[in-house]
Amino acid sequence: MTQWEVVIGLETHAQLSTVSKIFSGASTQFGAQPNTQACPVDLALPGVLPVLNRGAVERAIRFGLAIGATVAPRSVFARKNYFYPDLPKGYQISQYEIPVVQGGQITIQVPANEKAGKQAYSKTVNLTRAHLEEDAGKSLHEDFAGMTGIDLNRAGTPLLEIVTEPEMRSAAEAVAYAKALHGLVMWLGICDGNMQEGSFRCDANVSVRPVGQEKFGTRAEIKNLNSFRFLEDAINYEVRRQIELIEDGGEVVQETRLYDPDKRETRSMRSKEDAHDYRYFPDPDLMPLVIGADWIARVKGEMPELPAAMQQRFVEQYGVSAYDAGVLTSTKAMAEYFEALVAKAGAANAKLAANWLMGDVSSQLNRDGIDIDACPVSAAQLALVLQRIADGTISNKIAKEIFVTIWDEKAADEGAADRIIEAKGLKQISDTGALEAIIDEVLAANAKSVEEFRAGKDKAFNALVGQAMKATKGKANPQQVNELLKKKLG
């Protein structure tokens, strides 16, 4: 039986976070009434000329530097000719032979798949190019009975199309790459990453070939996948479809396909064009884009610290594990919250801060369906909670209760933790005399557990600790309780 190898390449359209469009001054704001953000340039009225948005170019440079690519000192805009109702000019301004960003790579972390018996691993995906282009408008098929409406608000919106080499070998790798890229463009501040609004969408080129064969199989391109789940489902379906088709004696046709999320299948949209079908030629209305070394140096100087460098710094500066550093730098907002937390709580509490962020804080964020930048507990408020754990004022259990109280109250005061501790009398009991008296009562009331412990049953000791903590309503210092119990039990 033939063993098949999957070959995947992704083309990702990232909408650049400029206020105006790539060749006009019209707004890029999402959600406006149809055709209220389309100026004469976007409408392709006679006599208008495009003017390149400098901000879009700088965002492309920033991306190129982040992935270790070559930023072309000279690149050219080209006309991509095709007809579609939502493309007013009859062509799209893009880049073809000389893109602004050439090469580069992104390292991805592919998670383990226990069902398939596969362990987690890392892989470097090479990029072919990233080029600037304008978006088309939008066809509205459901708003008018028997007719199609055209909304040109998106026409001219700046895009960075990021193209990989066909190096991914599974849907899991493709999703891992898409997530890594998504995180990077948001980290760099060049794209808001909003997939629901179409700011980040992927086209997947999928083919299969017998294992060991060098020649690529015929590919199908699945267009406009705007969620990671859709990307994974679409690729998996397409792989199955192609293998079944070939094994049944058929041939895969080069075509463009759409993914139907309701049926969880791809369906044919049109035959796939080759580059020559678009009759690319340099746009005579736009000068070649020249990017000098001084411009690149200035953009580089304004770039944020990149995730990989920050991960290494967290390991060295704060003593957290490489895994923890990866989680803490999963988003820029998470990394900034962690650094603000450590700055307030003290470097000595860095590991405690990391544990809380990855544990209780992340749990609450998931519960409420929000991101860290919308966390109702500020870094300063949480830092005070951690300081009170560290100085023995409260136990970790009580700290969790205080944290949830601050979260639910949406308290604004930085000293909320101290206020709640005083108001509810939550200070940890650390007085040895008071604890000894409580433990004596616990031992007297739990003679059976004492006997079991002395008979060698360690679980009985944990039961006694639990009774002591219950007697103090969780306010006893757990470490002291353990020490005093061991002392009294001999």
UniProtKB/Swiss-Prot annotation:
GO terms for molecular function: asparaginyl-tRNA synthase (glutamine-hydrolyzing) activity; ATP binding; glutaminyl-tRNA synthase (glutamine-hydrolyzing) activity. PROSITE patterns: GATB. The keyword Signal does not apply. It catalyses: L-glutamyl-tRNA(Gln) + L-glutamine + ATP + H2O = L-glutaminyl-tRNA(Gln) + L-glutamate + ADP + phosphate + H(+); L-aspartyl-tRNA(Asn) + L-glutamine + ATP + H2O = L-asparaginyl-tRNA(Asn) + L-glutamate + ADP + phosphate + 2 H(+). InterPro entries: Asn/Gln-tRNA_amidoTrfase_suB/E (IPR017959), Asn/Gln-tRNA_Trfase_suB/E_cat (IPR006075), Asn/Gln_amidotransferase (IPR018027), Asn/Gln_tRNA_amidoTrase-B-like (IPR003789), GatB (IPR004413), GatB_C_1 (IPR042114), GatB_Yqey_C_2 (IPR023168), Gln-tRNA_amidoTrfase_suB_CS (IPR017958). The keyword Protein biosynthesis applies. Its EC number is 6.3.5.-. GO terms for biological process: glutaminyl-tRNAGln biosynthesis via transamidation; translation. It is an enzyme of class 6 (ligase). Keywords: ATP-binding, Ligase, Nucleotide-binding, Protein biosynthesis. Allows the formation of correctly charged Asn-tRNA(Asn) or Gln-tRNA(Gln) through the transamidation of misacylated Asp-tRNA(Asn) or Glu-tRNA(Gln) in organisms which lack either or both of asparaginyl-tRNA or glutaminyl-tRNA synthetases. The reaction takes place in the presence of glutamine and ATP through an activated phospho-Asp-tRNA(Asn) or phospho-Glu-tRNA(Gln). HAMAP family: GatB. Heterotrimer of A, B and C subunits. Belongs to the GatB/GatE family. GatB subfamily. This is Aspartyl/glutamyl-tRNA(Asn/Gln) amidotransferase subunit B. It comes from Burkholderia pseudomallei (strain 668). The lineage of its organism: Bacteria, Pseudomonadati, Pseudomonadota, Betaproteobacteria, Burkholderiales.
